[in-house]
Amino acid sequence: VLGVDLNTRGSLAVTSTGAYWSIEYLNHWRKEYEKRRKSLQEHGSRYAHENVQRVGEKESGRFKNYLHRVAKEIVEEAVENGCSVIAMEDLDRIRDDLNRWHDWAYRRLYRYVEYKAEEWGIRVTQENPEYTSQRCSNCGFTHGGNRSGTSFCCQKCGYENHADYNAAKNVG
């Protein structure tokens, strides 16, 4: 089983094998496109309106392309490691701090992984993300104090690792 932890800060996805994809690329371009739209909307002309639509199309295309690439690499990671299942966080239960844009990106990523994995006979499941970042993937001890930012240190067995990697191991 390949576990995939999804995040809103730092990493888009981290797998239980340690593979990592940054969300900063998407966040950077989202802000750039927001600036371009705002600048064009201030003009109010028909030309500006048409350009706002083109900017939206470029933005959507860029994001879809990146998510396709990440999905392909996640599936390749599963194939290389002999995984018959890819377990991702259940997006219906994902954290309340997600805005609509992140929600869109994660749902699309899940769909892309699902159809690409099908080509390899790999099943994709959604797992409850509750406490995955607080549960030790080594001994199973769950405590809020186990995680501090990006660091994970189990208060019971002393296991230490990156918090997102630990969470990905718990998802899978």
Region spans (language model):
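Positively charged, helix-rich recognition surfaces that bind polyanionic ligands
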Residues: 1-172
